[in-house]
């Protein structure tokens, strides 16, 4: 049976930027951000070495939100380059201001749909890690097809990972956690990682405001990690 990538749909959110955010965006975005909102299949693959100005391990974070985890994990591993993808401009602006404040040099950003980025901008076997933290669970059954992590998406991610590369996910939605586990374990190129598995990147992440709120509501966070087979 053919695998199909999920239908792309996003919830509406306020996206107005503050005056300070607009100023920072105008000054820094041309240097460390690109827009993939206007999607075209003829887009060129990213040259990450040219974009970052060095050749090193690269991690892609899907749906970075306001960038709390992105910033902390990039600061923890300054020798690893991070590409943060987010469809909401306001979240990227918040991250951009934090990058400017803390003078972090190993983060780049893409404004657009992560599925498009993975399909057309990221080359096969080019990433050391893909992070998907708290993707929208789309809890209604009729909306499950919109969930980002589907068998076809996991297959695409596995193709973009280098051998030994890492898929790191987290969710506070129990049904989605079961689905993610099933899809990840069902991907032939991936094997489940545990505390004894040697990984090329850190999987230590900060607790975000969203996660704290979820825990206070009694939700259990499930963290799932896979390593691409050599």
Swiss-Prot record:
Pathway: tRNA modification; N(7)-methylguanine-tRNA biosynthesis
Enzyme superclass (EC): transferase
Keywords tagged on the record: Methyltransferase, S-adenosyl-L-methionine, Transferase, tRNA processing
Amino acids binding S-adenosyl-L-methionine: 61, 86, 113, 136
Highest rank taxon of the organism: Bacteria
Binding site for substrate: 140, 172, 208-211
One Pfam family it belongs to: Methyltransf_4
Active site, renumbered: 136
A cellular-component GO term for this protein: tRNA methyltransferase complex
Molecular function via GO: tRNA (guanine(46)-N7)-methyltransferase activity
Gene3D superfamilies according to UniProt: Vaccinia Virus protein VP39
Its EC number(s): 2.1.1.33
Reactions the enzyme catalyzes: guanosine(46) in tRNA + S-adenosyl-L-methionine = N(7)-methylguanosine(46) in tRNA + S-adenosyl-L-homocysteine
InterPro entries to which the protein is assigned, alphabetical: SAM-dependent_MTases_sf, tRNA_(Gua-N-7)_MeTrfase_Trmb, tRNA_methyltr_TrmB_bact
NCBIfam families: tRNA (guanosine(46)-N7)-methyltransferase TrmB (TIGR00091)
Stated role: Catalyzes the formation of N(7)-methylguanine at position 46 (m7G46) in tRNA.
Similarity comment text for this entry: Belongs to the class I-like SAM-binding methyltransferase superfamily. TrmB family.
PANTHER family according to UniProt: 3-DEOXY-D-MANNO-OCTULOSONIC-ACID TRANSFERASE/TRNA GUANINE-N 7 - -METHYLTRANSFERASE, PENTACOTRIPEPTIDE-REPEAT REGION OF PRORP DOMAIN-CONTAINING PROTEIN
The protein's name in its UniProt record: tRNA (guanine-N(7)-)-methyltransferase
Source organism of this protein record: Mycobacterium leprae (strain TN)
Gene: trmB
């Amino acid at each position: 049976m053919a695998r199909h990538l999920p239908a792309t749909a996003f919830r509406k959110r306020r996206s107005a930027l503050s005056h300070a955010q607009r100023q920072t965006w105008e000054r820094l975005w041309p240097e460390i951000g690109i827009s993939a909102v206007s999607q075209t299949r003829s887009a060129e693959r990213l040259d990450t070495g040219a974009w970052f100005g060095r050749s090193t391990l690269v991690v892609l974070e899907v749906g970075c939100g306001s960038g709390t985890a992105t910033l902390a994990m990039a600061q923890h591993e300054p020798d690893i380059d991070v590409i943060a993808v987010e469809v909401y401009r306001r979240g990227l602006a918040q991250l951009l201001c934090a990058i400017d404040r803390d003078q972090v040099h190993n983060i780049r950003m893409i404004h657009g749909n992560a599925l498009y980025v993975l399909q057309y901008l990221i080359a096969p076997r080019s990433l050391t890690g893909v992070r998907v933290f708290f993707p929208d669970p789309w809890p209604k059954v009729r909306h499950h097809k919109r969930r980002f992590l589907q068998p076809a998406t996991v297959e695409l991610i596995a193709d973009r990972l280098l051998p030994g590369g890492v898929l790191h996910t987290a969710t506070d939605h129990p049904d989605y956690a079961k689905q993610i586990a099933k899809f990840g374990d069902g991907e032939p190129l991936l094997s489940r990682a545990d505390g004894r598995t040697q990984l090329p990147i850190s999987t230590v992440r900060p607790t975000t405001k969203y996660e704290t709120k979820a825990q206070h509501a009694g939700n259990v966070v499930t963290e799932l990690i896979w390593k691409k087979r050599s």
